[in-house]
């Protein structure tokens, strides 16, 4: 993840050499900090940070050459939302940025359906508990810990 840019990077790890390879952008664009669902470089983020990998049982034995079984969820601080990035590089909104307030704002403190009602104000921390299928979100400007499930 890159706090100063609008991109999500990946670097492969070599367990024998105990080193990481060169990072590459898997979603977003370093020079365009905005908001857009999409695949790879067509997606747009604004200060993506603090992500967690969550095993997706729908992927079975895994997909792609790496047999990936995980989605990557992360905070987008300036877009006031949580993203889901799948192994194909498809970025989709997981929570936040529901309908604008009457004053045109997309942030705030609203509980409810993650895609249609929930609002955050600078989410900047994310943890996941696989035993309860629960996410815990550090909602900075709302000064609280919020929670949601994946389904």
Each predicted region: which residue ranges?
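Short loop/turn segments immediately following the C-termini of beta-strands
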Residues: 2-5, 13, 56, 77-78, ...
């Amino acid at each position: 993840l890159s706090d100063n840019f609008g991109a999500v990077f990946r670097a492969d790890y070599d367990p024998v050499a105990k080193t990481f390879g060169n990072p590459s952008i898997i979603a977003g664009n370093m020079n365009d900090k905005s908001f857009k669902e999409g695949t790879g470089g067509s997606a747009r983020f604004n200060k993506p940070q603090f992500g967690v990998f969550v095993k997706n049982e729908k992927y079975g034995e895994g997909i792609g050459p790496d047999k990936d079984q995980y989605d990557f969820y992360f905070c987008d601080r300036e877009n006031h939302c949580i993203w889901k990035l799948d192994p194909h590089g498809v970025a989709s909104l997981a929570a936040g940025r529901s309908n604008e307030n009457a004053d045109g704002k997309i942030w705030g403190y609203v509980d409810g359906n993650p895609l249609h009602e929930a609002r955050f104000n600078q989410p900047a921390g994310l943890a996941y508990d696989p035993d309860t299928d629960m996410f815990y979100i550090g909602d900075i400007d709302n000064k609280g810990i919020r929670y949601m499930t994946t389904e």
